[in-house]
Regions:
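Sequence/structural signature of beta-propeller domains
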Residues: 1-260
């Protein structure tokens, strides 16, 4: 496993998002556990997606998979408008877009017209309906890659009242980092199956990351909103290999005022 995200379900169990690797030996999956960490079940992506991933020669972004997971109760526009509030769904942030060269898979990837095959302009927010054991997805349009970066992707998704917050970021650190964003979008953005640039409300994390005049990490990684409405962000320290090992834990205040 490579746990990258965690959320609490209404029944008190935990769901973890585990990121897969490019080879497919470690698949992207959701893992449900009890409060003691005992695994209750594991869920992988649909077989046709896994088959396309296993046969494609375009593997550059396939190692950037499940990064965050959150729970949302129904109804959800465009996904489950019929669902009642007792029905819950898991929404999973896929870090970067995947492109398939496999015959027959073109319309299953994130760049079906091969506009930017090496680094698709869109990624996905997967939606898993546990009761039906069905997957759906919503496309998420990523910002343009800055000149000094290799890619832009997502690294978290968190449920808030009436919408969601994701982290969208580039892969550069220090003075080279340009996109370190919290992005809020409302439930209505899901209705047409794509979160567009116009539907994003952005909070720039760079001033907060730079407030101590230290090195700016490339990886804001986790977001949580407390019952009192306080929003927290944590960075990934990436251990100490080619990195200082620092972790930043940011308290950004009330969520309600961040995107005004």
């Amino acid at each position: 496993l490579d746990p990258e995200g965690i959320t609490v379900a209404p029944d008190g169990t935990y769901w973890l998002a585990s990121e897969g690797d490019a080879s497919g030996e470690r698949p992207n999956r959701l893992v449900q556990t009890d409060t003691l960490g005992n695994v209750l079940q594991e869920v992988t992506l649909p077989k046709r997606i896994e088959k396309c991933r296993s046969k494609t020669t375009s593997v550059g972004s396939l190692g950037s998979g499940f990064e965050g997971v959150t729970v949302a109760q129904g109804p959800l526009p465009g996904i489950a408008p019929w669902a009642g509030p007792r029905r819950y769904f898991l929404l999973v942030a896929q870090q970067r877009g995947w492109n398939y060269t496999t015959p027959g898979c073109r319309w299953l990837d994130d760049d079906p017209f091969d506009l930017n095959a090496d680094e698709p302009f869109a990624t996905r927010i997967w939606v898993y309906d546990m009761k039906r054991d069905k997957w759906k997805h919503v496309f998420y349009l990523l910002e343009s890659v800055p000149s000094d970066a290799s890619w832009v992707g997502l690294s978290e998704i968190t449920r808030v009242e009436g919408g969601f917050v994701v982290i969208e970021r580039d892969n550069r650190s220090g003075d080279f980092g340009e996109i370190k964003w919290l992005v809020h979008f409302s439930d209505s953005a899901l209705a047409d199956g794509i979160v567009t640039h116009a539907e994003k409300e952005v909070y720039d994390l760079l001033p907060d990351l730079n407030a101590t005049n230290g090195w700016i990490t490339d990886k804001p990684e986790g977001v949580a909103v407390t019952p009192a409405g306080e929003l927290y962000v944590v960075t990934d320290n990436d251990g100490v290999e080619d990195w200082s090992g620092e972790t930043r834990f940011l308290r950004l205040g009330k969520f309600a005022g961040l995107f005004d």
